[in-house]
Design a protein with these regions (language model features):
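N-terminal hydrophobic targeting signals that begin at the initiator methionine
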Residues: 1-3, 78
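N-terminal signal sequences
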Residues: 4-26
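Short, aromatic-rich membrane-interface segments at the entry and exit
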Residues: 27-34
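Membrane-helix interfacial anchor on the cytosolic side
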Residues: 40-58
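Cytosolic juxtamembrane segments of membrane proteins
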Residues: 54-71
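Catalytic alpha-helical scaffold of carbohydrate-active enzymes acting on polysaccharides/glycoconjugates
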Residues: 73, 77-200, 205-266, 285-379
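Surface-exposed cleft-lining segments at the edges of enzyme active sites
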Residues: 270-280
Length: 379
């Protein structure tokens, strides 16, 4: 078959540009744009073979990469796709903690804001109970400090507790010292509230990006066993297209990285991991992409969601059309989409899905003088 990947790239970029332009128009045209973009992605998947970037050979001069499997390849191949257990994660924060909201609401104003986090979290927990599923819940330290009983309830209902920072500040905008203090504070508050040890971390807005690799060393120093802050797609806030798609030990550390789910077509990683992508794009596109990863690549996926994403009655505090779209659109249908996903796929916490990798002996860390930045490991 001729190599049409170059043409595919042009078409995808053009479609994405059209989608963004239409988003500035009306709800009807933006819906049309989303459907068109999703249909294009689905059609392209029929023509381009999936490639696993993580299995390719590294460039000359780079150390070999270390992919971490949740099971041996032979065991995975013997597991029917319908039996693969995926990781469901929740970033537990309130509607005024988001990056979009931070432009309108300062940290000093948080205590004065009407909170909706308890009701939204309870709805998510009930939804998970309905489908006999459990999740990893990455808790914002500020929320744990204000609502410790809520965090203890989450843990008592069988969910894994992780750390989502204290003040929801992007890591790439912090110094190493500030990041360490923020994370240390959050970890202690969350552990005290939940009554359990916290070994998993997720950065706000997936903000551990090229140039902030020092954050991995700090996380390891603070006692974390894994991180789930890498989303290997292009985004204005986190351009991580060169990062691995499947779990890795971060170079030079014993820290396991659990990336967010992506669907690979040609040389492109398409976002299918939840959040705004699940809210704004058609369900069929997300569901098909997840099925491709499970059935063709024999890999579990990691999804994420925020409690405020199922709360369409949250206050509208955002100025500007784009901000309103990012925070509010799709909140009326998000719960129904989650219900469909939980009905069709199996989910568990990260610590359960990747228990084999987390319990296995980690590789010998690379000497500091020989380290190559984590994000440079994938060509």
């Amino acid at each position: 078959m001729p190599n049409y990947r170059g043409y595919a790239g042009v078409v995808l970029v053009a479609a994405a540009t059209l989608n963004i332009w239409l988003l500035r128009s009306s709800e009807a045209t933006s819906a049309f744009a989303g459907i068109t973009f999703a249909a294009l992605c689905l059609s392209l998947s029929c023509f381009f073979p999936l490639t696993d970037r993580d299995s390719e050979q590294p460039q000359a001069g780079l150390p070999p990469r270390r992919p971490i499997q949740t099971a041996s390849p032979s065991a995975q191949m013997q597991t029917p796709p319908s039996q693969i257990v995926n990781a469901f994660t929740i970033d537990l924060e309130d509607y005024f903690h988001t990056e979009v909201s931070s432009r309108e609401i300062d940290f000093e104003q948080w205590n004065a804001m009407p909170s909706r986090v308890e009701s939204s979290v309870h709805r998510l927990l009930d939804l998970l109970d309905e489908h006999h599923a459990q999740a990893t819940v990455f808790v914002l330290g500020w929320v744990a400090q204000r609502y410790p009983q809520l965090i203890r309830e989450v843990a008592s209902r069988g969910h894994e507790i992780g750390c989502h920072s204290y003040r929801h500040r992007m890591v790439n905008k912090l110094t190493p010292r500030v990041f360490m203090e923020d994370t240390r504070t959050a970890k202690k508050i969350i552990e005290d509230a939940a009554g359990v040890s916290v070994v998993g971390y997720r950065a706000p807005n997936f903000s551990i990006i090229p140039g902030t690799e020092w954050a991995f060393d700090i996380l390891e120093q603070l006692g974390f066993a894994y991180d789930s802050s890498v989303h290997p797609v292009w985004h204005a806030s986190y351009a991580n297209t060169r990062a691995p798609r499947f779990p890795y030990y971060v170079a030079g550390t014993n820290l396991l990285e659990i990336p967010i789910a992506t669907w690979r077509i040609g040389n492109f990683n398409l976002p299918i991991g939840g959040g705004a992508y699940l809210r704004l794009l058609p369900y069929s596109y997300i569901r098909h992409g997840l099925s491709v990863v499970n059935s063709r690549e024999w890999q579990p996926v990691t999804l994420y969601v925020h409690p405020w994403e199922i709360d369409y009655l949250q206050p509208a505090i955002h100025s500007g059309f784009a901000s309103h779209v990012r925070q509010h659109w799709g909140t009326r249908t998000m719960e129904a989409k989650l219900h469909r996903l939980l009905s069709s796929l199996r989910f568990a916490p990260i610590a359960t899905v990747h228990a084999h990798s987390l319990s296995a002996d980690p590789p010998v860390p690379t000497p500091a003088a020989e380290r190559v930045p984590f994000f440079a490991q994938v060509s």
